[in-house]
Amino acid sequence: MLPSQSPAIFTVSRLNQTVRLLLEHEMGQVWISGEISNFTQPASGHWYFTLKDDTAQVRCAMFRNSNRRVTFRPQHGQQVLVRANITLYEPRGDYQIIVESMQPAGEGLLQQKYEQLKAKLQAEGLFDLQYKKPLPSPAHCVGVITSKTGAALHDILHVLKRRDPSLPVIIYPTAVQGDDAPGQIVRAIELANQCNECDVLIVGRGGGSLEDLWSFNDERVARAIFASRIPVVSAVGHETDVTIADFVADLRAPTPSAAAEVVSRNQQELLRQVQSTRQRLEMAMDYYLANRTRRFTQIHHRLQQQHPQLRLARQQTMLERLQKRMSFALENQLKRAGQQQQRLTQRLNQQNPQPKIHRAQTRIQQLEYRLAETLRAQLSATRERFGNAVTHLEAVSPLSTLARGYSVTTATDGKVLKKVKQVKAGEMLTTRLEDGWVESEVKNIQPVKKSRKKVH
């Protein structure tokens, strides 16, 4: 049997309508936070998406007249805070919310501020390459602006000590997180510029969330970096963390350790450069000596090939000139070597590698001594060969023959007389002796009879 009072019977349409009215009147407007997913925007301009958290989700719609007041483009995975009305879509019985307003929540809001400041400073030209200052090469003093207790400072000092232990470092401690951090960072940058002790600054901190790194997205910090006369290397967080300070800085390093690598020089590389320079100097000296020796050999060969009585004086003069040129060239070479040594010594003194500098100086002095001794020995040998050549030439000279008591007689036509049949009585003859000439007239001609007969 049916009870005396029958329960109300709803049609599906009436049920959905009743539930919709209950939701709209009883709940009113609510604030909801969640993560956006399945975001779509059809041609109508309306937005359709899902808000979800770890355990639930709800369908959302935001009509065109509402979403055009939103100042950012919603992205998949973005956390937002919405003001909405709860309703039911009667044809399908789907429960949904109608969003009236939307704003980023948490990091979403920070991300929006980040993009707005980035666009503003970029429009002002603070990111332009023309304002980027070159880093000093090499750096003579490095300033570090970071927390004195953070891991970033430890990493920077560790790298600098390993790569360039003689490089001075000045630390400007400052907070890198919290409400007071931007002001302290700005004052540290201004202090470094006032003291003018450093020629490059590292500004940064270790990794963290967007909120942790937010001090380096502050407009005051960005403008202080841009106004710094000292080149600034930003080193904020990890390689994937990009802040406004990175865009304004003269150079962005992906990590604090990388920043220390950038501003320092590798001491081992410097020593290799010194070794390479020394080898080039030795090769230049060897080439110079070989070239001078070859030139001297050529001159000596030409001296031997020419007639000594005609070329002796000129070759001697040329030899003296060559000797002077060689001495002058040697002095210049030694002077340049000394100047190069002084430059290398100054560069090495800046890095304080004293033991290697001392060995390099000793090596150069030895080379200079060897070079001077080699040239002296060659010049001595040359003089000895030259004296021997003069002695030999004097020995075979016709003048030496005259000195031994011989003479040379010529006719009036200048021909040397070898037989009596070349002259006649009454002719005038000229005789060359060691100390002069004698003219004589032929009075008598008397041939010498041959003492031997020819054998047939």
Swiss-Prot record:
Pfam families: Exonuc_VII_L, tRNA_anti_2. Keywords: Cytoplasm, Exonuclease, Hydrolase, Nuclease. GO terms for molecular function: exodeoxyribonuclease VII activity; nucleic acid binding. Disulfide bonds: none annotated. InterPro entries: Exonuc_VII_L, Exonuc_VII_lsu_C, OB-fold_nuc-bd_dom. GO terms for cellular component: cytoplasm; exodeoxyribonuclease VII complex. Bidirectionally degrades single-stranded DNA into large acid-insoluble oligonucleotides, which are then degraded further into small acid-soluble oligonucleotides. PANTHER family: EXODEOXYRIBONUCLEASE 7 LARGE SUBUNIT. Belongs to the XseA family. This is Exodeoxyribonuclease 7 large subunit. It comes from Escherichia coli O157:H7. The gene is xseA.
